[in-house]
Regions:
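Extended, charge-rich alpha-helical interface modules
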Residues: 2-115
Length: 115
């Protein structure tokens, strides 16, 4: 996904495809699962402790930073996927008012404002 800020400092709208969302989710999920197996803790529970500064990370500082980062990516992409799905459902509901809903095989994309 390309993104940029224009000369006036205003964020530009960008698009992200469902393929990009799903690829990011798959990669983030794979990595967070490795950490869950290593530390015997769900990512959600880990992230709660991490966010509150309750972990004595010591020798695990790098692992914990990576785990938190990939978990945040996973959460962000899950939100993107939900927004994309809701937008498609809204369009399908509009179509349904006129009859049958047609689902095309063309890849949907989501416009996002990057912070």
């Amino acid at each position: 996904m390309a993104h940029s800020i224009n000369e006036t400092g205003v964020r530009n709208m960008n698009t992200i495809t469902i393929t990009e969302i799903l690829d990011d989710l798959r990669a983030a999920d794979e990595i967070t699962r490795r950490f869950e197996r290593r530390y015997w803790l769900s990512s959600a529970d880990f992230y709660e402790l991490y966010s509150q500064g309750l972990l004595d990370d010591g020798e695990h500082t790098e692992d914990f930073a990576l785990w938190a980062g990939f978990y945040e990516i996973k959460l962000d992409r899950e939100k993107d996927l939900q927004r994309l799905s809701q937008e498609r459902m809204r369009r399908f509901q509009e179509q349904a008012r006129f009859g049958v809903v047609q689902i095309a095989t063309s890849e949907p994309a989501l416009e996002v404002v990057l912070s």
